[in-house]
Amino acid sequence: MKARGHQEKKSIVLVNDAVTTLIGGKAACPDRQFDSYIGFIWGTGTNTCYMEQTRRITKLGSAADIDGTMLINVESGGYAKAPRGDLDAGFDATTVNPGGYMFEKMISGAYQGGMVRTVLVQAAKEGLFTAETGKRIAALESLSSKEIDDFLFRPYGENALAHCCGGVEEDCQTLYYLIDGLMERAARFVAFNLAAVMPKTGKGANPCRPVCVTMDGSTYYKSKLCKDKLSAYTKSFLNEELGLYCEFIKAENPNLIGAAIAGLLNA
């Protein structure tokens, strides 16, 4: 900044978007009594932030004796132990960072198109589509998350995947089921992600005081299938199996507000 002529001394605070999402969500509900807070990004990428008791963070040394909490940026998109199949590995090899951010590649919007295309091409090779539909699918050079949703909302409309099916009813249904299966897996993995983080908070056992999960990202809010599927797995897995309760909220401009609060608190 000095090289650009800004001589005034400035205090700079660098904050991750999952962290600002948590802060922004907390600020959006001052009248609610939540047990704890989580910031979750499910858009082009994915990440998680939660509140950890300082006494449990041993690397803080003597500072760990201070009673309080610290926001933890998990970088959950880099998780590498989720079960993967051959098609996951094959798609991963085509990305700019093979072997990196494997969890993100299985659930986030930036990789959704490539993953779906990989599955559809393999399905065509195995004869799940009619010959002409299979040829059109094989000719697809790329596929975006928007094009996937265009098909899900309008399977007989003017969009790339509907064109591939050429009006063949059975092919339309097969294509829909394959996409639905991948979205189902993504929603299940997000639920597992939350199921791993919530016990770390030690909170959320009381449904009257759930953990507040501020969700941010286009995959959660714009995908036709993902939001409802996550709600279903939250109920069946987190609530009924684990006895954990959370509430998903949408905050207005959580990153902007969270960054402003972080800046003010660290000025």
Question: Which residues are covered by each model-predicted region?
Answer:
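Glycine-rich phosphate-binding loop of actin/hexokinase-like ATP-binding domains
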Residues: 20-115, 121, 130, 134, ...
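ATP-binding/phosphotransfer module of carbohydrate and carboxylate kinases, centering on a glycine-rich
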Residues: 2, 27-28, 88-267
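Active-site neighborhood for divalent-cation/phosphate handling
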Residues: 1-27
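Short, basic and Ser/Thr-rich N-terminal targeting/leader segments
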Residues: 8, 42-44, 209
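Short coil/turn segments at beta-strand junctions that form active-site/ligand-binding loops
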Residues: 10, 34-36, 209-211
